[in-house]
């Protein structure tokens, strides 16, 4: 099969790093180095080059899509003869634990809010829609946290449905990685943002991923543009272990941390525990529930060592 035939056989356009970077097209970098440091995750080296070469072209593409969506809404309003209500544009970000979804979400939030239109951009993680630990313990699901059955999918779907229905005020529960649980009485209130970035393991999942809980509507039905942050497991596992070691030195040392006991481990013991957690929980969830959703994404960002994106695939 020729390269042209192979290109026609895939639903994606593929770009290497330099090809993708060229699509920035003179868009100015509106973030300072100090701001970028605040946006990066505990386990990542986020550079100015990464933002300029990967995220600026992506923010430019998203700006085109968002403007196109606004024009489509205007056409519908003209046809109906109505003043339509404000409908947020939803960007979904999926991928494995430790791949850097949260950093991607924060960088895009910062960049999209700095476009000349000065749009309001909210960021919500689906962690807030996990069942509380009390419920997970009752259902013997603590070791399945992050798996489809650990989420209150009905509440999550209602949340995105209300957002897309133009509801003026919508609330979302919040999750604490310190206590490893939902924070009671601490809902975040969203008031019709222009853009909602929804980040989580499960934003691309559909009916086939929830055979235990049949319902007809899914988060992915409401997402306008979806991004899958990808990396080979040979990188993901060491990233996860390294992140665990950094938490051991930092967050785990807090007496209020759910994982406070891990702070007392030797490095060798910590690596052993993290490797076991990856094998039994996060790696398993990746293979069974997250990776199978990758090809549903509008765009796939593939990372290499040091969390640098080396390839971008964009759905035609």
UniProtKB/Swiss-Prot annotation:
One of its GO terms (molecular function) is pantothenate kinase activity. It is an enzyme of class 2 (transferase). The keyword Kinase applies. It catalyses: (R)-pantothenate + ATP = (R)-4'-phosphopantothenate + ADP + H(+). Pathway: Cofactor biosynthesis; coenzyme A biosynthesis; CoA from (R)-pantothenate: step 1/5. It is found in: Cytoplasm. The keyword Transmembrane helix does not apply. Its EC number is 2.7.1.33. One of its GO terms (cellular component) is cytoplasm. Pfam families: PRK (PF00485). Gene3D superfamilies: P-loop containing nucleotide triphosphate hydrolases (3.40.50.300). Coiled coil: none annotated. GO terms for biological process: coenzyme A biosynthetic process. ATP binds at residues 95-102. Keywords: ATP-binding, Coenzyme A biosynthesis, Cytoplasm, Kinase, Nucleotide-binding, Transferase. Its main location: cytoplasm. InterPro entries: P-loop_NTPase, PanK, PRK/URK. NCBIfam families: panK_bact. HAMAP family: Pantothen_kinase_1. Belongs to the prokaryotic pantothenate kinase family. This is Pantothenate kinase. The gene is coaA.
